[in-house]
Amino acid sequence: MFSPLTKQLIEALQCLPGIGPKSAQRMAFHLLAKSGQAKGLALSDALQSAIRQVGECKLCQIYTEQPLCNICNNPKRDSTLLCVVESPADVVAIEQTQIYSGRYFVLHGHLSPLDGIGPQEIGIPALLDRLRNETIKELIIATNATMEGKATAHYVANHIDHTKIKCSRIAHGVPMGGELEYLDGGTLIHALHSRIPVEDN
C-alpha cells in the first residue's frame, strides 16, 4: 500500500513510546505533506544533532552536551544531598516543584531480573562509587512506586546500610504503580516533604 520509503518512515516512528501504527501513519503523512516538509527537515536536523552531541553527565547521568550538566555544575546546589531517580523525566518532574536543592543520580531504569536488568545495567556501581567519593549526608531514593522501583530502592539502601549516610525514600502520596513524571506538582511536593527511612519488611 505504501511506497518503500513511506513504509520505512512509518515503521521508524513506531519506535517512539505510545506511538502505534495509526499514529505513526498520521505523523508520517503530516511530515511528508508540502506544508510539513520544512518542519520534517528541521526535526531530522535536530534529531541528528542531538544523537551525535548529547551524552550523559559524568556525575549524574542526565542528558547533556557538556561533561557536567547544569545541575551538577551549579555551585548553589547542595552537594551533600543526592536524589536517585529512574529517568531524566523524573528529574524534570522534581525540578518543577522548585523545592529540592540537591543533586541527582539517574539510573535509566530499575532492577528487573526477569528482563536481565541487574545492578550493572542501571549504573548502581557508579552510584556507590559516588557515595564513597563524595561527602553525601542524605540519599533520597525517588524510584517509582512499582514492585521494581521498590526492589531497586531496597537494593540501594542495603548497600549503604553500613555507612553514615542517611537514607530516605520519598513518601507515597505517590500511588502504587504510579510514575513520577505523570504526577501533579502538589503530590510531588507532599511526597518529597514526607520522606521516610528505608526499612526492611
Curated annotation (Swiss-Prot):
CDD domains: TOPRIM_recR. Residues 80-175 form the Toprim domain. Pfam families: RecR_C, RecR_HhH, RecR_ZnF, Toprim_4. InterPro entries: DNA_Rcmb_RecR, Rcmb_RecR, Rcmb_RecR_Znf, TOPRIM_dom, TOPRIM_RecR. GO terms for molecular function: DNA binding; zinc ion binding. One of its GO terms (biological process) is double-strand break repair. Keywords: DNA damage, DNA recombination, DNA repair, Metal-binding, Zinc, Zinc-finger. A zinc finger (C4-type) spans 57-72. Belongs to the RecR family. May play a role in DNA repair. It seems to be involved in an RecBC-independent recombinational process of DNA repair. It may act with RecF and RecO. NCBIfam families: recR. This is Recombination protein RecR.
